Amino acid sequence: MEADALSPVELGLLLLPFVVMLLAALCVRCRELPASYDSASTESLYPRSILIKPPQITVPRTPATSYPLVTSFPPLRQPDLLPIPRSPQPLGGSHRMPSSRQNSDDANSVASYENQEPARKNVDEDEDEDDYPEGYLVVLPDSSPAAVPVVSSAPVPSNPDLGDSAFSMESCEDYVNVPESEESAEASLDGSREYVNVSQDAQPVIRAELASVTSQEVEDEEEEDVDGEEAPDYENLQELN
């Protein structure tokens, strides 16, 4: 009578806690399934230990002697280990140089080329210094007084050696050959040298005197050649300026 008196609403309220508990248990079970499935899959791929049960071998008894049964087991084999995959290494990774190091190497190379030019200049200067002789010549300016006395009006004797002096004057040189005599010895530093320096003012006068002397000598030689019995076939004549 009491069961008939319960309405469907009251019956649903009584069963509601059981339904909620059942749903909660199912949800918890569903959450645990993926973790257990992952562990089972990894164990199936990488087995930790495989136990192989060897077959039992029985030895028959002999009639003469009685021995207990002896069971022999084959040696256990270690499970084959699967290779562990490794991450691929990049090719040529060790040969690459960082950009900062390359930039520093380029800078050092440019600096080395720039430093070579001053070194070459120094080498050239050293070579030029080596080319100079050991002794140095001291050049006096034109304004400084000459240490050698200047002979302006010296008697010029008629001597064939004066032809060489005329040639030297024509070549614009600053010295004149003087014959060995008392006057020339006094004029040439007490006879230590055979020539004296001539100033620029006295050069035209000496040139005129030497030219007149050489022309007179040439005329005398021509007269002697005409008067002589054996005359040379040819004769070199110096053109006088």
From Swiss-Prot:
Residues 1-4 are extracellular. The chain crosses the membrane at residues 5-28. The keyword Ubl conjugation applies. Residues 78-139, 209-241 are annotated as: Disordered. Phosphorylated on tyrosines by ZAP70 upon TCR activation, or by SYK upon other immunoreceptor activation; which leads to the recruitment of multiple signaling molecules. Is one of the most prominently tyrosine-phosphorylated proteins detected following TCR engagement. May be dephosphorylated by PTPRJ. One of its GO terms (cellular component) is COP9 signalosome. Keywords: Adaptive immunity, Cell membrane, Immunity, Lipoprotein, Mast cell degranulation, Membrane, Palmitate, Phosphoprotein, Signal-anchor, Transmembrane, Transmembrane helix, Ubl conjugation. The modification Phosphoserine is found at residues 41, 44, 87, 104, 109, 112, 199, 212, 215. The keyword Cell membrane applies. Residues 136-139 are annotated as: Interaction with PLCG1. Residues 175-178, 195-198 are annotated as: Interaction with GRB2, GRAP2 and PIK3R1. Residues 97-115 have a biased composition (Polar residues). A lipid is attached at residues 27, 30 (S-palmitoyl cysteine). Residues 124-133, 217-233 have a biased composition (Acidic residues). Engagement of killer inhibitory receptors (KIR) disrupts the interaction of PLCG1 with LAT and blocks target cell-induced activation of PLC, maybe by inducing the dephosphorylation of LAT. PANTHER family: LINKER FOR ACTIVATION OF T-CELLS FAMILY MEMBER 1. When phosphorylated, interacts directly with the PIK3R1 subunit of phosphoinositide 3-kinase and the SH2 domains of GRB2, GRAP, GRAP2, PLCG1 and PLCG2. Interacts indirectly with CBL, SOS, VAV, and LCP2. Interacts with SHB, SKAP2 and CLNK. Interacts with FCGR1A. Interacts with GRB2, PLCG1 and THEMIS upon TCR activation in thymocytes. Interacts with THEMIS2. This is Linker for activation of T-cells family member 1. The gene is Lat.
